Amino acid sequence: MATPAGRRASETERLLTPNPGYGTQVGTSPAPTTPTEEEDLRRRLKYFFMSPCDKFRAKGRKPCKLMLQVVKILVVTVQLILFGLSNQLVVTFREENTIAFRHLFLLGYSDGSDDTFAAYTQEQLYQAIFYAVDQYLILPEISLGRYAYVRGGGGPWANGSALALCQRYYHRGHVDPANDTFDIDPRVVTDCIQVDPPDRPPDIPSEDLDFLDGSASYKNLTLKFHKLINVTIHFQLKTINLQSLINNEIPDCYTFSILITFDNKAHSGRIPIRLETKTHIQECKHPSVSRHGDNSFRLLFDVVVILTCSLSFLLCARSLLRGFLLQNEFVVFMWRRRGREISLWERLEFVNGWYILLVTSDVLTISGTVMKIGIEAKNLASYDVCSILLGTSTLLVWVGVIRYLTFFHKYNILIATLRVALPSVMRFCCCVAVIYLGYCFCGWIVLGPYHVKFRSLSMVSECLFSLINGDDMFVTFAAMQAQQGHSSLVWLFSQLYLYSFISLFIYMVLSLFIALITGAYDTIKHPGGTGTEKSELQAYIEQCQDSPTSGKFRRGSGSACSLFCCCGRDSPEDHSLLVN
């Protein structure tokens, strides 16, 4: 019989010994593993990473998701083509009207002279201003297009008039270059003259129009050149785009907001002249087109696209969810049965990046299609936003086709090479970006005043990127050669700058970049080569030797993996290079 002291010592030892019953996992031994349970988990994991063809052989389930993606590619591409044809007509109509306005309202304008079109004398400036207003007043008689005035379209300074002629100048300004003195009050004053087109009776000659309704008041304009900032002419015109009849669509009504600017903020003796337009598209009030087609087919087709993408979204989202559930089951199983934690990278293997790509494309397609329906109903006019949404979604849909090519060894070279080379390429690009940005800032601050290609940071980046690809080398050097007489020091610096950049990036950076890609290709081109070691998850799955045609995958339908097409990965004996 044990003594009380012995019993107390035994109880103390038992309490101080780690035990699962006291809420701690330290020192716990994994629960015994049932061979059947573990084999069933391996089999479900292997099925989850099978290709659609292997899943069909394993359970006889048709790859419905694959067939749905093929249908989605067709309908999305057809939709994009139809919208592209319509959008092309809109952009063409807008650009051609802008060109027509420049020829109508800018005195002496010629195509391609936007950057050099300017006034250099006071007489030229007055003539250009009066010419633009005169052309506006007689526009219905001279233009080839059908335009209508917009009463009250002169902007906030028009006071309800159709056209506003405004000059902006400093409140007080006195400049005396002879004595190197100036006196400027930087407050800006805006003076405007309102002009309305006359309501011409039928029997009045056009040359007498200037004297009706006081429209000739703009002729009394007096510019304060010594303190002038700019002169602006703002008005609106309406027209109808009949080109849409080509695509069997109802024409749209357009309102062009036109702004002519005579810019003198530099006070350099040169006043650039530019014309800018903004377009507003709205539905015509009482459209009447004989024998025009019905747009119900386009609406029905858009609805089909939305339904197809919605179904694709649901199936892909369900597959992602089932992958997440299977991952949790695997993590819990490995901890309870083997006492091992699963790393983050192994968990991410359950996340199919291709499904995320397809889900993103579905969201963009649905958003773009809804916007397209609004545009065709004349409730929206965001053609550019709709184009970006539909174009990006179509790009992602077609890129998603590569996933199904990765199920074949010979078609998987591109994806496998990118997968192996991507980490090294990203690190390499980070180092190169530092040098590239340094050249951008240096070129902008030093060469910007002397070279048109270095006037802004974005232009510098575009110029240097073109030089890397071997484009416009001679033109870039020649433009700096013309500036040699202005500053020999800057010209010498430009030679060192350009030669060092071209030599560094073409002969070294590009060569190393290509070497990284080539090295990755050499790694994976050998049979069985993947460029990376197999993870513990892959090694665990490979212990399942059941082939898809063994019939064992048909047992137990309560699988946590997708019922249709999941992320494809061939069996290990095939030695295929599959990227998920």
From Swiss-Prot:
A motif (Selectivity filter) lies at residues 469-474. Palmitoylated; involved in association with membranes. Channel activity is controlled by multiple regulatory mechanisms in different subcellular compartments. Lower pH by itself has an inhibitory effect on channel conductance. Channel function is transiently modulated by changes in Ca(2+) in a pH-dependent manner; pH changes modify the aggregation state of unitary channels; a negative cooperativity between extracellular/lumenal Ca(2+) and H(+) is suggested. Fe(2+) channel activity is potentiated by low pH. Belongs to the transient receptor (TC 1.A.4) family. Polycystin subfamily. MCOLN1 sub-subfamily. It comes from Mus musculus. Residues 1-38 are annotated as: Disordered. This is Mucolipin-1. It is found in: Late endosome membrane; Lysosome membrane; Cytoplasmic vesicle membrane; Cell projection, Phagocytic cup. The keyword GTP-binding does not apply. A motif (Dileucine internalization motif) lies at residues 573-578. InterPro entries: MCLN_ECD, ML1_ELD, Mucolipin, PKD1_2_channel.
